[in-house]
Amino acid sequence: MNKVAQYYRELVTSLSERLRNGERDIDALVEQARQRVMQTGELTRTEVEELTRAVRRDLEEFALSYEESL
């Protein structure tokens, strides 16, 4: 598995759990995650931006489906 896919899985898993636990500010969650990934230096800026977009998109979908299931 490449590094982008690995980070994607880790971030979606951890951030989804935080959403389940009551955090609701997706922008803040994604920004914190972006900063953590940037600090590792393992991905290029372009990879980080693509990763961030994908994570944000999927978290927003998760949040909508989670709210609908309540």
Task: For every predicted segment, state its role.
Residues 4-70:
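Amphipathic alpha-helical membrane/lipid-surface binding segments
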